[in-house]
């Protein structure tokens, strides 16, 4: 075993004939040349793709690692090949035929061996690259966002807060950025995002949610429906009138008296009655019959008509009116007639006391 002293060294070989008894010999020079193996990057970056088919497999372009592996070496002087195991890489056997479009054979994570060979000396070096298939964000289908047609009633457009859907979509997941789009194409390309408050362009309207992993950049999309529900159309009722027996402006009312007229045949409507507009708007502190008015003579209460399915409501006013009772004199003069036939009965004209 001889250890070289330099990359290129001359040694001498003595050749002596062993068949003769003389000491005759000759010698020749032997030049020993030691070529370096390629000095490559032995820790190249991972190659990552997104798991578009959710099966752990993806399409990789292995050549994307070429520049990093060569680490400054002239690519025209070296040949790079890829292998699925170390033995093949060492023996230059069974290279990956399509490194520009390679599908991993081990789901999610796989090691690939890289062989870099000098085109002149045939010296080579090997390293590995890691392939990673990143999972897509899991987005949960949200329920539609529903608004009532309160602004410009009848135009079926409202201003939506799109972020109201995020909690349902993520279900507590973190590290996922959510954005909203009008088309699937925009969602896929991450172009033309829309923002809150967002006014729908049709009723109902489907928009698209993109959830992107903050680290891997992998994304999923899902749809979100926007709906504008009509508000009830209660009829304005006639005043409810009750007699005021003591003429103090107060009495008891049956506030539900006009319920059928107010609902006017509309389905899925429930009514509640309130002393103030604020209470009616908030659906709190309803009043029930018999109701004793708190404003003398004439009082306005507020009727909330609410759809039991959508929760949308409208409010109409209901007037309560107290009617004064006739005031009778404390003493009315007696009507006296004669009992001509002495039988205790007679005919009386009661109208003669009308003016009294």
Predicted regions and their residues:
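Extracellular low-complexity Ser/Thr/Asn/Gly-rich intrinsically disordered segments
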Residues: 3-356
């Amino acid at each position: 075993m001889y250890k070289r002293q330099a990359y290129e060294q001359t040694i001498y070989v003595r050749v002596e004939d062993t068949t003769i008894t003389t000491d005759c010999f000759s010698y020749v020079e032997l030049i020993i040349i030691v070529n370096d193996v390629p000095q490559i990057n032995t820790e190249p970056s991972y190659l990552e793709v997104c798991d578009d088919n959710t099966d752990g497999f993806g399409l990789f372009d292995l050549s994307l690692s070429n520049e990093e592996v060569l680490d400054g070496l002239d690519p025209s002087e070296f040949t790079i090949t890829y292998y699925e195991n170390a033995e093949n890489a060492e023996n230059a056997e069974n290279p990956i035929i399509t490194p520009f479009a390679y599908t991993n054979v081990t789901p999610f994570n796989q090691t690939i061996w890289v062989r870099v060979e000098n085109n002149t000396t045939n010296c080579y070096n090997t390293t590995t690259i890691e392939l990673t298939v990143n999972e897509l964000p899991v987005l949960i289908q949200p329920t539609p966002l529903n608004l009532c047609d309160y602004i410009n009633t009848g135009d079926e457009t409202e201003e939506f807060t799109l972020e109201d859907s995020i909690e349902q979509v993520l279900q507590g997941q973190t590290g996922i950025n959510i954005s909203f789009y009008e088309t699937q194409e925009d969602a896929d390309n991450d172009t033309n995002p829309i923002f809150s408050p967002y006014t729908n362009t049709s009723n109902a309207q489907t928009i698209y949610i993109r959830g992107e992993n903050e680290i891997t950049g992998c994304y999923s999309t899902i749809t979100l429906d926007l709906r504008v529900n009509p508000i009830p159309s209660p009829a304005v009722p006639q005043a409810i009138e009750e007699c005021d027996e003591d003429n103090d402006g107060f009495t008891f009312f049956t506030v539900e008296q006009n319920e059928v007229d107010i609902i006017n045949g509309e389905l899925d409507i429930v009514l509640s009655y309130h002393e103030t507009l604020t209470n009616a708007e908030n659906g709190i502190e309803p009043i029930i019959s018999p109701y004793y008015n708190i404003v003398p003579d004439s009082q306005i209460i507020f009727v909330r008509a609410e759809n039991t399915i959508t929760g949308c409501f409208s409010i109409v006013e209901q007037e309560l009116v107290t009617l004064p009772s006739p005031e009778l004199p404390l003493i009315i003069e007696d009507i006296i007639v004669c009992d001509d036939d002495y039988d205790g009965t007679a005919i009386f004209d009661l109208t003669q006391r009308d003016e009294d």
